[in-house]
């Protein structure tokens, strides 16, 4: 019996080792793919003049069905001092043509065109390219309220300047366009977190919040200096979890609003 158990244990150990090796190989291959896509990416030049207050990252991969609504919501912002970095992740539909149309109409729209390498790699290249003091995120099937950037930047500038605001965050709606248009408020930001600026390590409730990375602004200098990045895994699933956790353990000052600013599509 002991010999059989030992044999089973050895077999199990070998299987686990093979699985671990396979996983490491897949990660290495994905990282190599992301690095190659980054190296060959084509980035449109920034317009002359001072850097914008906000850089909004729009990660795009075969998103033509909803992309115009997303970009229209950016173009209609009441706060105008921003650049929109449209990161085309190897789209094979009409997404690239849509981006180019917006670039022709509005110099605030810029293109980062790269081979497909996943959501995380797209976001990190956007962070590296961004020039704004703060970075926002708009996914291509969602859309902002017209005052979204104005509200978030107002939170930043309305706080005392002794310590810079690292994160400004607001609420959002779940959104359905079919069979009938409707919104459902999702209250991530609520008292006591909305009462005053806070350090996330002092308010543990923030670590249990849904990681809605696209209803916020992040201070670019914090992300760059502290190495806060997205995981460059394949596809577009759950990269926001790791990013949000790293933001909370890094940020020194967070401000929140109970107002909702973004429609997060559920029928895509």
Where are these regions (language model features)?
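Nucleotide-sugar donor-binding/catalytic module of glycosyltransferases
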Residues: 27-268
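Short Lys/Arg-rich cationic patches that frequently serve as NLS/NoLS or arginine-rich RNA/DNA-binding motifs
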Residues: 1-40
